[in-house]
Amino acid sequence: VLLAHLPDVLDRLRLAGAREIGIAATVPPGMPFPPRADDEDVVLLACRRATFEWALRASVVGRDAITLREGVTVAGLEGEQRGGGRPTVTGVRLADGTVIPAALVVDTTGRRSHAPQWLAALGAPAPRERAVETGIFYYTRFYRQRRARAPQGTTGLVASDLGWIKLAMFPGDGDTFSITVGAPVDEPRLKGLSDPHRFERFLAAFPSVAPWRARGASVPIAGADTPVLVMGQLKNRL
């Protein structure tokens, strides 16, 4: 999609050190993977979300057809009845009362979206949704690898599901990567993973990620004070 529609964003990401990983390189050793002619079209872009959003913003700012409004808050939707059916959304209302008319409103605020309440205020039904609790917390810490000491011959992409615990390692831009532990919410002993020292001791027990932290292969991205980021209330939504 980026290559076809936003090549300037892809160029910025490449300059920032984003890595492109072909689908064949992600297959675990020993797993049969018959190649297909279109495999080269499936590419993972390894970069941090902040880097991606920076590149996307830079592209938006440079386009005359797009107006970027910063420091404003959307407080609700504007709408009207047409033909006696459901209300039609006609724009958004800002916190200061300003109304911005629109032919199409796209809400990308994620799981904390106020769209259901805003639609209800217009007399419209909320979007249909199915949500299932995942039953896990995410504990994530970011690192910067030292090329001379990092494990060689691997993409740095790790995904391990051990049943009682899940581990994932994601390569990023500029020699960065993150390690995430998915821990069950009903296991109080694992809540200590929010402490960086306990988090590191925990990682050392797993061969899939331990080499990336052993013998100075990497350092926490902001030094010893790099926090372990915790994400809860995780749901799968459809």
Predicted regions span which residues?
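Active-site substrate-recognition segment that forms the wall
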Residues: 119, 157-188
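Conserved beta-strand termini and adjacent loop/short-helix elements that scaffold enzyme active sites
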Residues: 16, 71, 214-215
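Conserved N-terminal helical subregion
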Residues: 19-105, 109-118
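N-terminal FAD cofactor-binding segment of flavoenzymes
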Residues: 1-28
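FAD/FMN-dependent oxidoreductases across multiple families
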Residues: 189-238
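Central beta-strand plus flanking loop segment that forms part of the substrate or channel wall
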Residues: 112, 120-153
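Short acidic-glycine loop/turn motifs at beta-strand connectors
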Residues: 81, 147, 172-175
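A structural signal for short hydrophobic beta-strand segments in well-ordered beta-sheet cores
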Residues: 76-79, 143, 169
